[in-house]
């Protein structure tokens, strides 16, 4: 966090972030030239899949293909791909660990290039998907749509980096947060419309309790950690380790192994994997299985099979992705270099083994909590017989809670820095 002479730095940062978010939100509704949006809206009202495609990026029920329609999603996808490449390619992994600031700049540049490539892919998909909806569609119009949407995505990336650097909060996270929040009025309206006069008060109270438990569980999942205490060779407790993010003058240094190291990635990967069979079937490649999947037994047990698979895949992806985020071997090597060890555990192989065992237990607990929380929207839907609750998934709640917690921490940091500045001014 940069120290600033301006005592109103918190307000300035907040206004900058809000201004950029408002500008991006307005740009989402700035129509791309060449598209007859009146005809497009008429077509979309009758084709649910196209409505879903167009409204996915904007975060609500808009039917406008705007300059910032792609929003920050190309960058999010590029970041995920980059994380996987760093974990799979030894050269990139070594560059990230040993390259310092210059390496971070190189990886950021590669991520931006991936963002550009992914923007081209997504904008091309949108352009060709609109072919059936636009009478005036041609290759020139498709090219213009691709250029507009790709340019818009890169502008959004640039503005999000300005928020991260000079504003309040993390730019990409705030943009996703804004998209989710913008869809909440429609979600509330849908729930009220579907439930009016149909749902008993007891079901509402039970669902409210389940939602409260879900929010509490998400906060616990986001903030919960297992502290692995450390001891330095010189027995000094005045400063914390660079990677610990915290220190305790009574108990010494510690490594915070969080319950949910992988964030929402296990849910994203699980959803992507479970969509693949349906996608392949719709292409006509698995038509031979039609007699099997139309059996009454399969139809009745389909939801059970789906959610058991959902639960198991989240467990597996959580265990896998957590090893990418925190590698016990790398952590052990760093401790050895800094002449720091875990009390009662020998440095080297024994420390690596100990960290692996602790991480397995912590990650398994976090994965079980994440999988249980992921099924809660469906529990509420079953109680109320409403389809609207599936639109407010665990991923959205995790992002909402995570962004709020991050903003709270950053605001506290700015306030404390200003207090210290006043003390020594």
Curated annotation (Swiss-Prot):
It comes from the Eukaryota. It is found in: Plastid, Chloroplast thylakoid membrane. It is a multi-pass membrane protein. InterPro entries: SecY, SecY/SEC61-alpha, SecY_CS, SecY_dom_sf. Pfam families: SecY (PF00344). GO terms for cellular component: chloroplast thylakoid membrane. Disulfide bonds: none annotated. Its main location: plastid. GO terms for biological process: intracellular protein transmembrane transport; protein targeting. Keywords: Chloroplast, Membrane, Plastid, Protein transport, Thylakoid, Translocation, Transmembrane, Transmembrane helix, Transport. The chain crosses the membrane at residues 15-35, 62-82, 113-131, 139-159, 168-188, 201-221, 266-286, 304-324, 364-384, 385-405. Belongs to the SecY/SEC61-alpha family. Component of the plastid Sec protein translocase complex, which is composed of at least SecY, SecE and SecG. The central subunit of the protein translocation channel SecYE. Consists of two halves formed by TMs 1-5 and 6-10. These two domains form a lateral gate at the front which open onto the bilayer between TMs 2 and 7, and are clamped together by SecE at the back. The channel is closed by both a pore ring composed of hydrophobic SecY resides and a short helix (helix 2A) on the extracellular side of the membrane which forms a plug. HAMAP family: SecY. This is Protein translocase subunit SecY. The gene is secY.
């Amino acid at each position: 966090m940069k120290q600033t002479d301006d005592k109103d730095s918190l307000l300035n940062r907040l206004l900058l972030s809000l201004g950029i978010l408002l500008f991006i939100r307005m740009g989402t509704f700035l129509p791309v030239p060449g598209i007859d949006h009146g005809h497009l809206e008429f077509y979309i009202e009758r084709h649910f899949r196209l409505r879903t495609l167009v409204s996915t990026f904007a975060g609500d029920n808009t039917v406008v293909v705007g300059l910032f329609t792609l929003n920050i999603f190309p960058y999010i996808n590029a970041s995920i791909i980059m994380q996987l490449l760093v974990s799979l390619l030894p050269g990139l992994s070594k560059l990230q660990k040993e390259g310092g600031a210059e390496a971070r700049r190189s990886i950021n540049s590669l991520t931006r290039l991936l963002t550009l490539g992914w923007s081209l892919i997504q904008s091309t998909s949108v352009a060709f998907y609109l072919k059936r909806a636009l009478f005036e569609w041609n290759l020139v119009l498709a090219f213009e749509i691709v250029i507009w949407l790709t340019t818009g995505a890169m502008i959004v990336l640039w503005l999000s980096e300005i928020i991260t650097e000079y504003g309040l909060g993390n730019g990409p996270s705030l943009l996703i947060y804004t998209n989710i929040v913008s869809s909440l009025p429609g979600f509330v309206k849908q729930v009220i419309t579907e439930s009016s006069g149909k749902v008993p008060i007891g079901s509402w109270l039970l669902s409210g309790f389940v939602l409260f438990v879900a929010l509490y569980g998400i906060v616990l999942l986001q903030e919960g950690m297992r502290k692995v205490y450390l001891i330095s060779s010189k027995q000094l407790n005045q400063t914390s380790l660079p990677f610990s993010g915290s220190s305790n003058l009574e108990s010494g240094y510690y490594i915070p192994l969080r319950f949910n190291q992988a964030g929402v990635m296990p849910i994203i990967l699980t959803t992507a994997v479970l969509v693949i069979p349906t996608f392949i079937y719709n292409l006509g490649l698995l038509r031979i299985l039609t007699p099997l999947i139309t059996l009454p037994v399969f139809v009745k047990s389909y939801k059970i099979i789906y959610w058991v698979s959902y639960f198991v895949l989240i467990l597996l992806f959580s265990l896998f992705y957590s090893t990418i985020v925190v590698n016990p071997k790398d952590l052990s090597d760093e401790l050895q270099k800094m002449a720091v060890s875990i009390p009662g555990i020998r440095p080297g192989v024994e420390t690596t083994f100990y960290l692996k065992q602790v991480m397995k237990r912590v990650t398994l607990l976090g994965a079980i909590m994440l999988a249980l929380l992921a099924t809660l929207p469906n529990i509420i839907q079953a109680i109320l017989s409403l389809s609207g609750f599936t639109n407010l998934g665990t991923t959205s709640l995790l992002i909402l809670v995570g962004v709020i917690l991050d903003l709270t921490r950053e605001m506290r940091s700015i306030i404390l820095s200003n207090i210290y500045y006043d003390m020594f001014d």
